[in-house]
Amino acid sequence: MKISNSKTSLEFERNKDFFQVRLESTQFKEAVLKELSDKVIVNEDNETWVLSYPVPEAAKSLASATRLAKTRLERLKLAQKLATLSGLENQFKIPFLHPENILLMGETLFVVHFGLHKLLAPFDMTPVDFLKSYKALIFYIFNSKVPFESLVSGSLAMNDKFSQTINSFESTQEIAEFIDEELQKETEKINRNIAFVSKGRYRFFKYFGTLAIILALVLGWFTYYYYSNSQKQNAIITAQTDFLTNNYDKTQTDLQNYSPSKLPKSARYILAVSSVNLSDLTTTQKQAILNNISTKSDDNTLNYWVYSGRGDFKQALNLAQNLGDVQLTLLAYTNLYETTKLNTTMDGAKKQQLLDEYNKKIQELTKNLGK
């Protein structure tokens, strides 16, 4: 699908775990490679680049969220979230503002693909362009049947009073304040129209209250089951959001109560990448490992890094040996050696025995790798 913000057009595709952007040779400079986040997977395809951004499966595009917003109150709440975009103006990273490139995860709104000044499309964005795109996003939320490209180009005039008021503002702050006021008015209007429960409904609830209690008991187990799964899903969503902001420590903490076998591959993938980024390896070593980790990696490889990130190096060692990977086995033994060395509560004789055992394995594996 090709999307445009009037100045820049990009080819993009969204699948289960990734948001992919295809760039023509005129849309990037080779020097941009070192500026890209380590979360972005770069693949060359003939004379084009494909940038793959990992995104939470549960994240919805602004375009999808807009189609689901049926009432004016829902649309105002959605428009209110756009206020977080104002902090992206006049930065080295240039947001590509389009409803398909803006995702929502719960209450969090974020832009997926950014350009870099003179290095990666979009190459630049003036304050005038930013404000025009911001207004077009507001118009789109309230007129989703109109293509965003028509709204941002200004080829279609919006004649309703609300749109004309938005169009008259000269800053995103003014727009945000206006949206806040409109949201408050709409909320108060709805609250005034809420009717009290009628007498007939009151009798219904009175006589059928006992039945409701019985049903509640019968459904108790199902509720508990749903709640447990809901908690896990919320934890995964939180972890994915923290992962997208490079908060790798928090990503690990979010899912620490769930064993790898209970987590989907997408969740284990972000835990594995977080574990690598938090390890004591060099930047070059980390990048080499990250280049070989994806949501398609086998379970043992992903679980190895999940357990390593949690400090369960014995389980990580078992998985490395199962894989037959000498380098991962060496790393597991090295981690075991270091944690044992720092353990001040272990029996002295037992500690020395383990250190000797781990050191012997480290020497053997290092020698094998050197052959």
UniProtKB/Swiss-Prot annotation:
InterPro entries: T7SS_EssB, T7SS_EssB_C
NCBIfam families referenced in this protein's UniProt entry, alphabetically: T7_EssB
Name of this protein: Uncharacterized protein CA_C3710
Species of origin: Clostridium acetobutylicum (strain ATCC 824 / DSM 792 / JCM 1419 / IAM 19013 / LMG 5710 / NBRC 13948 / NRRL B-527 / VKM B-1787 / 2291 / W)
